Amino acid sequence: MPSNVRSGVLTLLHTACGAGVLAMPFAFKPFGLMPGLITLTFCGICSLCGLLLQTRIAKYVPKSENASFAKLTQLINPSISVVFDFAIAVKCFGVGVSYLIIVGDLVPQIVQSIFYRNDDNMSGSQEHHMFLDRRLYITLIIVFVISPLCFKRSLNSLRYASMIAIVSVAYLSGLIIYHFVNRHQLERGQVYFMVPHGDSQSHSPLTTLPIFVFAYTCHHNMFSVINEQVDKSFKVIRRIPIFAIVLAYFLYIIIGGTGYMTFGENIVGNILTLYPNSISTTIGRLAMLLLVMLAFPLQCHPCRSSVKNIIIFIENFRKGKLYDNRASFIPLDNFNSEDPQEAPTQQNNEEPNLRSESLRHINIITLCILLFSYLLAISITSLAKVLAIVGATGSTSISFILPGLFGYKLIGSEFTGTNERVPTSIKIFKYLSLSLFIWGIAVMVASLSAIVFLGTSSH
């Protein structure tokens, strides 16, 4: 495998396999094992179709420019650029909130395992409860660690977070396999191989379906990967999403399948909270804690840029000026929202805009993102609920709806107004695009309706 292809695979894999893997076993709960595996497979295929469509439509961007969702909107309708910015803002904001929830889940357990392991007399004291309050640690970490990083204009210091993420997820996989093999010490519930029935089905499968969708979402970085390739032919580039999705699929089988079989119906939204305190578990919790602390700024920066773009769009709309270009917008084209190795590229692009725009406005947006993230994180304890909402909105838009829309509008457009026969392969991709677009709309509407009316808890 060529090095640039390998690099692209690792970029997509890291983007997809973030801290959301902690909720993967919980996603199996309303499905049962076999239907869960089938759903995981189907969502993987749909996500792969979206990535393959992106490799097909990248050629419609002029060769002198880098491919991006923003550039493609200029070929269809510049006004829909706000849809892409909204999807990015929702996804990045939601992922940031989920990171803070993970902080609230893990830090009290880390503190308890280190300082209160052998102190049973503290279990009922007021001091004990105060030092194990999740809100305390969310507050401390967002004030002293996350906020300073989010207000930085350079993310170069976070370039090693990608390696930390890969190592953390690999360690988590090993930890889950170990406890699956040695599960006699754990409180295991009923494992359903088919869909749970009766009282055992606490909530609808539609409420956790978006977690499967969210798990494969790496589409916002696909164009950046394509732009880095020397050979941009479909025959070569298609290997990148295929390898990445297949690797992610097997990783999710390990984490999701074995995690569900370990705890059964007792599984919760964050599997790490179920393991007993031990050195190996504490190391895993510390690794995931470090991951989410370093990754939060990588979500805040693109969220901030998207919010700024939306504000500019609204201002232009009120003035009756919908530009045919995005010269006044903060670019997201080359920003990898989860890979710190891409962050310097975005920073270089963002510098001129930061000089022209008021830093005060940028700081206000950053402060609002941090404040609302904090308020939601201390109010919501369900990691699964946040990931389900993000998956049903931002992930479906980025993975299915936008690639489907662009594919249907652009693929085969070169044959419009000509007498040439449209090749069968072009027709297949065009109608695949339409199907993916319809599927994305259906998932969004059905899942959001289920979440709103049926609810999603972490238990």
Swiss-Prot record:
Molecular function via GO: L-arginine transmembrane transporter activity; L-glutamate transmembrane transporter activity; L-histidine transmembrane transporter activity; L-lysine transmembrane transporter activity; L-serine transmembrane transporter activity; L-tyrosine transmembrane transporter activity; transmembrane transporter activity
Cellular component annotations (GO), alphabetically ordered: fungal-type vacuole membrane; membrane
Membrane spanning stretches: 8-28, 33-53, 82-102, 131-151, 161-181, 206-226, 240-260, 278-298, 364-384, 386-406, 434-454
Sequence segments annotated as region (Disordered): 335-354
Polar residues composition-biased segments: 335-351
Superkingdom of the organism of origin: Eukaryota
Subcellular location: Vacuole membrane
Topology class, membrane: Multi-pass membrane protein
Gene Ontology biological process terms, A to Z: amino acid transmembrane transport; transmembrane transport
InterPro entries found in the cross-reference section: AA_transpt_TM
Keyword annotations of the record: Amino-acid transport, Membrane, Transmembrane, Transmembrane helix, Transport, Vacuole
Annotated function: Probable amino acid transporter of unknown specificity.
Similarity section: Belongs to the amino acid/polyamine transporter 2 family.
Name of protein: Vacuolar amino acid transporter 5
Natural source organism: Saccharomyces cerevisiae (strain ATCC 204508 / S288c) (Baker's yeast)
